[in-house]
From Swiss-Prot:
Family: Belongs to the NrdR family.
Gene expressing this chain: nrdR
Protein name: Transcriptional repressor NrdR
Cofactor: how bound: Binds 1 zinc ion.
One function term, GO molecular function aspect: ATP binding
Domain of life: Bacteria
Function: Negatively regulates transcription of bacterial ribonucleotide reductase nrd genes and operons by binding to NrdR-boxes.
This protein's record includes keyword Zinc: yes
Ranges of Polar residues composition bias in the record: 1-11
Amino acid sequence: MQCPTCQNTDSRVLESRSADSGKSVRRRRECLNCSFRFTTYERVETMPVSVLKKDGGRELFDKQKLFTGISRACEKTNFSSEEIINFVDGIESQIVQDSNKDIKSSHIGELILKNLRKENEVAYIRYASVYRKFNGVKDFISTLESLKGSSKNQLASIS
């Protein structure tokens, strides 16, 4: 690692610790030439993921786009900003894990719905209404009925 003050490439590591929820390593270093101390962060470089669109197009995965869509669905719910960020990070991890460079946009949408359904029913309905292009009240009612049915099944399995 190059020293920011003298550009020497020899340094020693004074301290290492996990950072960013285990996704990177923070290292405190000291230059062997000028004794300047500095901090570096190391993280695994991930391969870019391409999203295969329904129209046949392809674009790079955009975490900000994911965050925007989920944030809109979670407006005025009990989801905090930090919970949304953690939720998006979790979805991103699943996308990277599930894909081998390419992932279908429909797979991302279903992944979000599956996870939102567990976390917040209101956010789930909001996201589903946009993702599945609800045309009217009947679409909302059928989705609410399926939510209601799965809630009853979960309660029955607990009893």
